A protein has these predicted regions:
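N-terminal helix-turn-helix DNA-binding core of bacterial DNA-binding proteins
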Residues: 1-32, 58-60, 100-101
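Basic, amphipathic "hinge/linker" alpha-helix immediately C-terminal to the N-terminal HTH DNA-binding motif
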Residues: 19, 54-78, 151-155, 220
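Amphipathic alpha-helical dimerization/coiled-coil segments
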Residues: 16, 69-128, 158-194, 200-202, ...
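Short alpha-helical elements of helix-turn-helix
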Residues: 2-11, 37, 68, 111
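Canonical helix-turn-helix DNA-binding module
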Residues: 22-49
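Short helix-coil-helix linker/hinge
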Residues: 1-7, 64-65, 95, 107
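Beta-hairpin "wing" of winged helix-turn-helix
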Residues: 44-54, 58-61, 126-127, 208-209
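Accessory beta->alpha helical hairpin/"wing" motif in late/C-terminal subdomains of nucleic-acid enzymes
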Residues: 60-63, 127-160, 209-227
Length: 234
């Protein structure tokens, strides 16, 4: 189902966690609207995406974090797609620097934030590194299961200080993924979503129009250096 190139491009566009229209997804996949409709129907029937009617329009979203995790895993395993344009090269660099992984931050940004919180004692339970020779259930680009990270008292105070509100749900508070570009841990779970939401709400990062890349704003660069000791390289 996801081996088809057009369908995989549709899924990757939706992996940001946002809802997108069929026309936007057709443009992302480089196919016609009618062809996109057929692919979207197959993905919905397969339980990988969900649709919402908005008047005469339909918007689509990824079915859940588990699907996004599978996509990250496949991206790590798949051979890199040849970059044949400046636009493609720029997008690849942007994704490595800062992107969303479903509803949390990934790339150098996500990995750097988690590393900083571990170094400063805001998180405990591991070192943020992926050691394949020691891993039992952890795999690149998948949800981590080997370690049990937790927020410390100092971490609770820090999160309150920078305005992070953790959403209520039955999802675990702290989860982690093995980042597919950095091969280190980034935060997921409710905490990962709360941090992403705060960065977007405060204007520290801005979304791309369609794909998962994020742009760190000047205000975001300041916060990262001041609160996390993190200088994000281009």
């Amino acid at each position: 189902l996801i081996a088809d190139r057009a369908r995989s491009k549709i899924l990757l566009a939706l992996a940001s966690g946002r809802e997108l229209s069929a026309s936007v997804l057709a443009d992302e996949a480089g196919i016609s609207r009618s062809t996109a409709s057929a692919h979207l129907r197959k993905l919905a029937d397969g339980g990988l995406i969900a649709a919402r009617n908005d008047g005469r329009n339909r918007h689509f979203r990824i079915a859940g974090p588990e699907v996004a995790g599978v996509l990250e895993r496949l991206m790590e395993l798949a051979p890199p797609e040849p970059i044949t344009s400046l636009r493609g090269s720029t997008r690849a660099a942007q994704l490595r620097r800062a992107r969303t992984c479903y509803d949390h931050l990934a790339g150098r940004l996500g990995v750097g934030i988690m590393h900083s919180m571990l170094q400063r004692g805001y998180l405990a339970g591991g070192d943020g590194l992926f050691a394949p020779e020691q891993a039992v259930d952890d795999h690149p680009a998948g949800h981590g299961r080997d370690l049990d990270y937790r927020v410390t008292d100092a971490g609770d105070a820090f999160l309150e200080q920078i305005g992070v509100r953790v959403p209520d749900s039955r999802r675990p508070l702290v989860r982690y993924c093995i980042d597919w570009t950095e091969t280190r841990h980034h935060l997921a779970g409710r905490l990962g979503r709360g941090i992403r939401d705060r960065f977007l709400e405060a204007g520290w990062v801005k979304r791309s129009a369609t794909h998962r890349a994020l742009k760190v704003t000047p205000a975001g660069e300041t916060i990262l250096e001041r609160e996390f000791g993190l200088v994000l390289q281009p």
